[in-house]
Design a protein with these regions (language model features):
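Sec-dependent N-terminal signal peptides
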Residues: 4-15
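N-terminal, motif-rich segments that launch catalysis or mediate targeting to/interaction with membranes
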Residues: 18-124, 133, 138-252
């Protein structure tokens, strides 16, 4: 029994912590832009109405074999030469299809609160994912996971650098980082747009990311200096758009 527990802990630590601070930051930022009616509706659905906590639920559930079929929901891989609209869609679903489905389920009065909780938690997570450019990267390198780099001398990969490494370098909690973003950025010039436009934005960014890094590169302070502002803006934008999406669902 002890060995099984140790094995479970090790597997969990290897598979599921990536991006936790970023996702929770996005959820925390979103809370500041929710209407009162939206907050009330969310509280009816979730036992814990914190969007920050809800944001990592879908990653935490990946250890459950029943949830593996939802793994394709977290990304949409396509060649850089074509847009999502012109790409071949996966029969297993992708991040855009999953966002559309989640929104539809949350608007449907015939859907139970239990089922709505499932789709709400996924929606909170996926709107964060779609604003991380490597989640719409190339299929051939699994969104940068197969581009191996050195991060301050340690083994990493391009996807992890954007998901986790740059954020962790600042050693902020998600509450500290969200407070910093809310002080630093304004929602005034951010358009809410749609998931189809979000993925186009991220694809434009990922083209630049790919062009600046190759397999085996050493990344450190220079890379943070050149790119971390993009990470912060994406986290803030994702939070604002998450709130806008939820307000549209629950308060319009």
């Amino acid at each position: 029994m002890k060995n099984k527990f140790i094995c479970f802990v090790l597997m969990s630590s290897l598979l599921f912590p990536w991006g936790k601070t970023g996702h929770r930051t996005t959820g925390e930022v979103a809370e500041h832009f929710l209407t009162e009616k939206t907050k009330i509706e969310i509280q009816k659905i979730l036992h814990d109405p914190s969007l920050a906590i809800a944001s990592t639920w879908s990653d935490e559930m990946r250890s459950n074999p029943d949830f593996r079929k939802y793994n394709p929901w977290h990304y949409a891989n396509m060649p850089l030469s074509i847009t999502y609209a012109n790409s071949k869609k996966s029969s297993k679903g992708d991040i855009v299809q999953a966002i559309k489905l989640s929104k539809s389920k949350l608007k449907d009065n015939n859907v139970s609160f239990e089922e709505k909780a499932f789709y709400l938690k996924y929606l909170v997570h996926l709107i964060g994912d779609i604003h991380q450019p490597l989640h719409v990267g190339r299929g051939e390198d699994r969104g940068g996971n197969d581009i191996k780099v050195k991060w301050f001398g340690d083994d990493s990969n391009l996807h992890r650098v954007w998901d986790t490494n740059m954020i962790d370098n600042y050693q902020m909690s998600y509450t500290e980082l969200s407070s910093h973003l809310l002080r630093s950025y304004s929602s005034e010039n951010i358009e809410l747009l749609s998931e189809n436009e979000w993925i186009d934005e991220s694809q434009n960014k990922v083209k630049i990311i790919y062009s600046n890094v190759k397999n085996g590169d050493y990344l450190g302070y220079d890379y943070i200096y050149e790119n971390f502002d993009i990470v912060k803006i994406q986290l803030f934008t994702a939070g604002y758009r998450l709130a806008g999406t939820l307000n549209e669902i629950f308060d319009e």
